[in-house]
UniProtKB/Swiss-Prot annotation:
Protein name: Adenine phosphoribosyltransferase
HAMAP family in alphabetical order: Aden_phosphoribosyltr
GO molecular function: adenine binding; adenine phosphoribosyltransferase activity; AMP binding
GO biological process, one term: purine ribonucleoside salvage
Enzyme class: transferase
Annotated GO CC locations: cytoplasm
Keywords noted in UniProt: Cytoplasm, Glycosyltransferase, Purine salvage, Transferase
Catalysed reaction equations from the record: AMP + diphosphate = 5-phospho-alpha-D-ribose 1-diphosphate + adenine
Protein backbone atom coordinates (compact mmCIF):
# COMPACT_ATOMS: atom_id res chain seq x y z
CA UNK A 1 0.00 0.00 0.00
CA UNK A 2 1.46 3.33 -1.04
CA UNK A 3 0.76 6.66 0.59
CA UNK A 4 2.55 8.69 -2.08
CA UNK A 5 0.71 11.55 -3.72
CA UNK A 6 0.30 10.70 -7.40
CA UNK A 7 0.74 14.39 -8.19
CA UNK A 8 1.13 17.67 -6.33
CA UNK A 9 -2.37 18.96 -5.85
CA UNK A 10 -3.82 21.93 -3.95
CA UNK A 11 -6.88 20.36 -2.36
CA UNK A 12 -8.36 23.75 -1.52
CA UNK A 13 -9.16 24.03 -5.23
CA UNK A 14 -11.66 21.21 -4.65
CA UNK A 15 -13.51 22.85 -1.76
CA UNK A 16 -16.51 24.95 -2.74
CA UNK A 17 -17.30 27.91 -0.48
CA UNK A 18 -21.01 28.65 -0.16
CA UNK A 19 -21.97 31.90 1.61
CA UNK A 20 -25.02 32.11 3.86
CA UNK A 21 -25.48 28.35 4.22
CA UNK A 22 -27.06 26.82 6.23
CA UNK A 23 -28.00 30.27 7.50
CA UNK A 24 -27.15 33.90 6.88
CA UNK A 25 -23.64 34.89 7.95
CA UNK A 26 -22.18 31.38 7.71
CA UNK A 27 -19.60 30.47 5.08
CA UNK A 28 -20.03 26.75 4.33
CA UNK A 29 -17.05 24.71 3.13
CA UNK A 30 -18.54 22.06 0.84
CA UNK A 31 -16.47 18.86 0.65
CA UNK A 32 -18.77 17.20 -1.91
CA UNK A 33 -16.67 18.76 -4.68
CA UNK A 34 -13.58 17.08 -3.20
CA UNK A 35 -15.02 13.61 -2.73
CA UNK A 36 -16.56 13.46 -6.19
CA UNK A 37 -13.16 14.04 -7.83
CA UNK A 38 -11.43 10.64 -7.96
CA UNK A 39 -7.94 12.13 -8.24
CA UNK A 40 -8.39 14.71 -5.47
CA UNK A 41 -10.11 12.22 -3.15
CA UNK A 42 -7.29 9.68 -3.65
CA UNK A 43 -4.73 12.36 -2.82
CA UNK A 44 -6.71 13.52 0.23
CA UNK A 45 -7.09 10.02 1.66
CA UNK A 46 -3.43 9.22 0.96
CA UNK A 47 -2.32 12.33 2.84
CA UNK A 48 -4.62 11.58 5.77
CA UNK A 49 -3.57 7.92 5.83
CA UNK A 50 0.11 8.84 6.02
CA UNK A 51 -0.42 10.81 9.25
CA UNK A 52 -3.01 8.52 10.82
CA UNK A 53 -0.95 5.36 10.16
CA UNK A 54 1.82 6.81 12.34
CA UNK A 55 -0.62 6.89 15.27
CA UNK A 56 -1.14 3.11 14.88
CA UNK A 57 -4.90 3.05 15.46
CA UNK A 58 -6.89 -0.12 16.03
CA UNK A 59 -10.11 1.58 15.01
CA UNK A 60 -11.27 4.87 13.46
CA UNK A 61 -14.34 6.66 14.81
CA UNK A 62 -16.32 8.87 12.43
CA UNK A 63 -18.57 11.66 13.68
CA UNK A 64 -22.04 11.85 12.11
CA UNK A 65 -22.33 12.30 9.27
CA UNK A 66 -19.54 13.71 7.15
CA UNK A 67 -16.93 12.17 9.43
CA UNK A 68 -18.15 8.79 8.14
CA UNK A 69 -17.10 9.81 4.62
CA UNK A 70 -13.50 10.14 5.74
CA UNK A 71 -13.21 7.50 8.46
CA UNK A 72 -14.69 4.52 6.58
CA UNK A 73 -12.42 4.62 3.50
CA UNK A 74 -9.39 5.35 5.68
CA UNK A 75 -10.15 2.36 7.92
CA UNK A 76 -10.30 0.19 4.82
CA UNK A 77 -7.05 1.66 3.50
CA UNK A 78 -5.25 1.25 6.85
CA UNK A 79 -6.65 -2.20 7.65
CA UNK A 80 -8.28 -1.16 10.90
CA UNK A 81 -11.85 -1.07 12.19
CA UNK A 82 -14.44 1.68 11.86
CA UNK A 83 -17.18 2.79 14.23
CA UNK A 84 -19.74 5.58 14.22
CA UNK A 85 -20.52 8.36 16.68
CA UNK A 86 -24.16 9.27 16.05
CA UNK A 87 -27.05 11.39 17.20
CA UNK A 88 -29.69 9.89 19.52
CA UNK A 89 -31.88 7.11 18.13
CA UNK A 90 -29.64 6.27 15.16
CA UNK A 91 -27.74 3.22 16.47
CA UNK A 92 -29.26 -0.19 17.23
CA UNK A 93 -28.59 -2.01 20.48
CA UNK A 94 -27.25 -0.63 23.73
CA UNK A 95 -25.51 2.72 23.42
CA UNK A 96 -23.43 4.97 25.63
CA UNK A 97 -24.09 8.69 25.30
CA UNK A 98 -22.62 12.04 26.16
CA UNK A 99 -24.41 15.38 26.21
CA UNK A 100 -22.37 18.45 25.47
CA UNK A 101 -22.91 22.18 25.25
CA UNK A 102 -22.94 24.23 22.09
CA UNK A 103 -22.96 27.99 21.68
CA UNK A 104 -26.75 28.03 21.62
CA UNK A 105 -27.93 24.86 23.30
CA UNK A 106 -26.98 21.26 23.80
CA UNK A 107 -26.34 18.22 21.64
CA UNK A 108 -25.74 14.54 22.27
CA UNK A 109 -23.57 11.81 20.76
CA UNK A 110 -23.98 8.04 21.05
CA UNK A 111 -21.74 5.06 20.44
CA UNK A 112 -22.68 1.39 20.58
CA UNK A 113 -21.67 0.03 23.98
CA UNK A 114 -19.57 -2.75 22.45
CA UNK A 115 -17.98 -0.70 19.64
CA UNK A 116 -14.64 -0.21 21.38
CA UNK A 117 -12.71 -2.66 23.50
CA UNK A 118 -11.01 -1.08 26.53
CA UNK A 119 -7.54 0.13 25.61
CA UNK A 120 -8.07 0.14 21.86
CA UNK A 121 -6.18 2.91 20.08
CA UNK A 122 -8.70 5.20 18.38
CA UNK A 123 -8.44 8.14 16.00
CA UNK A 124 -11.58 10.26 15.68
CA UNK A 125 -12.43 11.94 12.36
CA UNK A 126 -14.75 14.67 11.16
CA UNK A 127 -14.98 16.82 8.07
CA UNK A 128 -14.39 20.18 9.74
CA UNK A 129 -13.08 21.64 12.99
CA UNK A 130 -14.65 24.97 13.93
CA UNK A 131 -15.11 25.74 17.65
CA UNK A 132 -14.07 22.23 18.72
CA UNK A 133 -17.11 21.37 20.82
CA UNK A 134 -18.21 18.30 18.88
CA UNK A 135 -14.71 16.90 18.44
CA UNK A 136 -13.86 17.43 22.13
CA UNK A 137 -17.13 15.74 23.16
CA UNK A 138 -16.36 12.84 20.81
CA UNK A 139 -12.98 12.35 22.47
CA UNK A 140 -14.66 12.38 25.90
CA UNK A 141 -17.28 9.84 24.76
CA UNK A 142 -14.63 7.53 23.34
CA UNK A 143 -12.70 7.69 26.61
CA UNK A 144 -15.93 6.98 28.49
CA UNK A 145 -16.12 3.60 26.71
CA UNK A 146 -12.45 2.82 27.41
CA UNK A 147 -10.72 3.99 24.24
CA UNK A 148 -7.20 5.33 24.17
CA UNK A 149 -7.72 8.30 21.85
CA UNK A 150 -4.40 8.78 20.08
CA UNK A 151 -5.36 11.53 17.65
CA UNK A 152 -8.00 13.45 15.74
CA UNK A 153 -8.12 14.32 12.07
CA UNK A 154 -10.24 16.64 9.94
CA UNK A 155 -10.31 17.64 6.33
CA UNK A 156 -10.71 21.34 7.17
CA UNK A 157 -9.75 23.43 10.19
CA UNK A 158 -11.10 26.96 10.64
CA UNK A 159 -8.04 28.18 12.56
CA UNK A 160 -9.46 31.54 13.65
CA UNK A 161 -12.13 29.78 15.73
CA UNK A 162 -9.41 28.13 17.85
CA UNK A 163 -11.16 24.76 18.15
CA UNK A 164 -7.77 23.06 18.32
CA UNK A 165 -7.29 24.57 21.79
CA UNK A 166 -10.17 22.45 23.16
CA UNK A 167 -8.46 19.21 22.17
CA UNK A 168 -5.95 17.32 24.29
CA UNK A 169 -4.85 14.94 21.53
CA UNK A 170 -2.73 15.54 18.42
CA UNK A 171 -4.77 17.04 15.57
CA UNK A 172 -4.14 16.61 11.86
CA UNK A 173 -5.91 19.07 9.55
CA UNK A 174 -5.57 18.45 5.83
CA UNK A 175 -6.47 22.06 4.99
CA UNK A 176 -6.53 25.17 7.15
CA UNK A 177 -8.55 28.31 6.53
CA UNK A 178 -8.24 31.64 8.33
CA UNK A 179 -11.46 33.60 8.05
Amino acid sequence: MSFQDPQPLDLKNYIREIPDFPKRGILFYDISTLIRSPDAWQVATARLARVIAAWQPDILAGIESRGFLTAAPLALRLGCGFTMLRKPGKLPGKTISLKYGLEYGEDELHIQADAIKPGQRVVVLDDLLATGGTLAASIDLLRKVGAEVVGASVLIELADLKGREKLDVPLNALMTYDE
